[in-house]
Regions:
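NAD(P)-dependent Rossmann-like dehydrogenase/reductase catalytic/cofactor-binding core
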Residues: 164, 217-307
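Short, well-ordered alpha-helices that flank and scaffold nucleotide-derived cofactor binding pockets
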Residues: 17, 21, 86-90, 113, ...
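Short alpha-helical
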Residues: 33, 79-80, 105-106, 154, ...
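NAD(P)+-binding Rossmann beta1-loop-alpha1 motif at the extreme N-terminus of oxidoreductases
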Residues: 1-51
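Rossmann-like NAD(P)(H) cofactor-binding subdomain of soluble oxidoreductases
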Residues: 52-136
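Internal alpha-helical scaffold of NAD(P)-dependent oxidoreductase catalytic cores
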Residues: 37, 90-91, 114-119, 134-186, ...
C-alpha cells in the first residue's frame, strides 16, 4: 500500500512516521526547513508510546511529486483544504481513498467539490502533537487514534483493509457506521481552543476560574444545540462527558488553534467557532458565547493573514 501524507505537521508527521516505521511506502508533503530535515534525516518522533527515528523520507513541497497513491491522508489545516484539493487528483487512481483528518465538520464536503465523492471517507483523529523543531514531532497527550468511516454509513471491504494496515503500524483506529456524528463529537471537543486563545490560558489555568469554566459549559451547550438541530445523534450527557475528558488532560494542554493565535499565525477560527456561528444562524440556534469568541479573535486572524 502506497500512502501519501498531505501535510507533515503534528498529525501527519506522527501517523506518517508510524506507517513508515512499519514498512509501508510513505511519501510526505512538507515545506521549508522541516522538509529538508525529513528528506535528509527522516522524522524524529518523541512519543508517550515510544520514540522512533525513521529513515530519510520521500518528501516534497509539491503534491504531484509524491506519486500516485492508494491512500491520501490529509493532514493540512482545515482552511488549506481549498488550496490543495484540485492538486490531489494528480496522485490519485480510480480506487484511491482520500482520508481527511481535519478539525471541524467541513472537510469532506469541501473535498467533494473537486473530487468524486466515491474516493472520500469521513475521518478524524485524536492526538496532542506538534512540530518542535525541523524534522521533529512531539506526541504529548491522548492515545493517538484515527476514527473513520464511509459517508454512506456502510462497512466496506476497502476500509476494513485500511483498518488492518493501520493496526500493523500500531495505530489505534476505529471504523464507524456514523462518522458524521463522530466528527461532530470531536467538534464539540475542539472548539474550546478558541476560549483558551481569548483567555491566553492553558486548559488547566482556565479551568481554575469558575466563571470561565461555566462559560466553557455554555460554549459546549451551544454546539450541542446546533448539532441536534442539524440532526446529529448526540447523547444527552455528551457535554458532561466531554468536560470530564478535558479534566483528564495535562494541566498545560493547549490545542493547535490556541497556539496559532498566540503565535500570530493563521488559524482554524473560521472552521471552529466561526462554523458554530454560521451553522447556528442557518438552523436558527443562538450561539452568543461562540459568537463572542469568533468576533473577538477575528481582528487577530485578519492580522495574521495580512503578513
Amino acid at each position: 500500500m502506497k500512502i501519501a501524507i498531505i501535510g507533515t505537521g503534528g498529525v501527519g508527521g506522527y501517523f506518517g512516521a508510524r506507517l513508515l516505521e512499519a514498512g509501508f511506502d510513505v511519501s510526505f508533503l512538507a515545506r521549508g526547513e522541516h522538509l529538508e530535515a525529513i528528506k535528509k534525516n527522516g522524522i524524529q518522533l518523541k512519543s508517550l508510546l515510544g520514540d522512533i527515528q525513521t529513515k530519510p523520507c520521500k518528501a516534497s513541497d509539491k503534491i504531484s511529486d509524491l506519486g500516485v497513491s492508494d491512500v491520501l491522508i490529509i493532514g493540512v489545516k482545515a482552511w488549506q483544504i481549498k488550496e490543495i484539493r484540485t492538486e490531489l487528483q494528480s496522485i490519485m487512481h480510480k480506487d484511491s481513498i482520500v482520508l481527511p483528518l481535519q478539525n471541524g465538520v467541513m472537510a469532506a464536503d469541501e473535498l467533494s467539490e473537486t473530487i468524486d465523492k466515491q474516493h472520500i471517507v469521513g475521518g478524524l483523529c485524536r492526538i496532542v502533537s506538534m512540530i518542535t523543531a525541523p524534522g521533529c514531532i512531539a506526541h504529548t497527550g491522548v492515545t493517538p487514534t484515527i476514527v473513520f468511516g464511509e459517508l454512506d454509513h456502510t462497512i466496506s471491504t476497502r476500509l476494513q483493509n485500511l483498518q488492518e494496515n493501520f493496526k500493523k503500524a500500531n495505530i489505534h483506529c476505529q471504523l464507524s457506521t456514523n462518522i458524521e456524528t463522530e466528527i461532530w463529537k470531536k467538534f464539540l471537543l475542539i472548539c474550546i481552543s478558541g476560549l483558551m486563545a481569548v483567555t491566553r490560558c492553558t486548559y488547566g489555568e482556565m479551568n481554575e476560574v469558575e466563571l470561565t469554566r461555566q462559560m466553557m459549559f455554555k460554549l459546549l451547550e451551544e454546539i450541542y444545540a446546533v448539532g441536534i438541530a442539524k440532526g446529529i445523534q448526540y447523547e444527552p450527557d455528551i457535554v458532561a462527558r466531554t468536560v470530564a475528558s478535558f479534566d483528564a488532560l495535562p494541566y498545560n494542554t493547549t490545542f493547535s488553534l490556541t497556539r496559532d493565535v498566540w503565535e500570530g499565525k493563521p488559524s482554524e477560527l473560521e472552521y471552529q467557532n466561526g462554523t458554530v456561528v454560521h451553522i447556528g444562524k442557518q438552523v436558527k440556534v443562538p450561539t452568543p458565547i461562540n459568537e463572542f469568541i469568533y468576533t473577538s479573535l477575528l481582528p487577530l486572524e485578519k492580522k495574521a493573514r495580512t503578513y
